[in-house]
């Protein structure tokens, strides 16, 4: 019976209404203690729109944010930041699906590029970082280490025609020890 009493008190504190943020953006939806809390929609002064969950006046939980320029994020939020699993649709038709940390692509994720290229791997502050595989639309691929959005460390570049390089990379260039294997069966070690 105590549980029912707590639920009733909580249910009575939720109201449906409007809230204007200090920047002039307007929220409509569930309000608790005078702030957005629960499901609602915010229309921002710049034309952006967010529909989803709020907690204590901040985007928190699942939501969809549509930018005025046509970009869109669908996913998890934590204290007004993209945080957790989400999908971002870029205006140039790239699409990222993966983990976010404080508004950055961070952790495991996949980027589908507008030209048909695909990257599957780790991200750090919106840059490819750590281990990942980049597959070009023409069939070539790179499987290896990344740093600051560039091939860096050990990796294998396969041209998709029987030629491949296995070795060290530095800032997107072959650097250090490596082996070039030709489609003819020849091999160059250097």
What kind of region is each of these model predictions?
Residues 11-49:
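N-terminal segments that cap or nucleate solenoid repeat domains
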Residues 7-9:
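Intrinsic low-complexity/disordered segments
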Residues 43, 66, 88-89, 108-112, ...:
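TPR/Sel1-like alpha-solenoid repeat signature
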Residues 15-17, 40, 63, 86, ...:
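One face of beta-strands
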Residues 26-37, 49-60, 72-83, 95-106, ...:
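Conserved anchor residues at repeat-unit boundaries in beta-strand-based tandem repeats, strongest
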Residues 1-5:
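Bacterial N-terminal signal peptides
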Residues 17, 185-190:
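Leucine-rich solenoid repeat scaffolds
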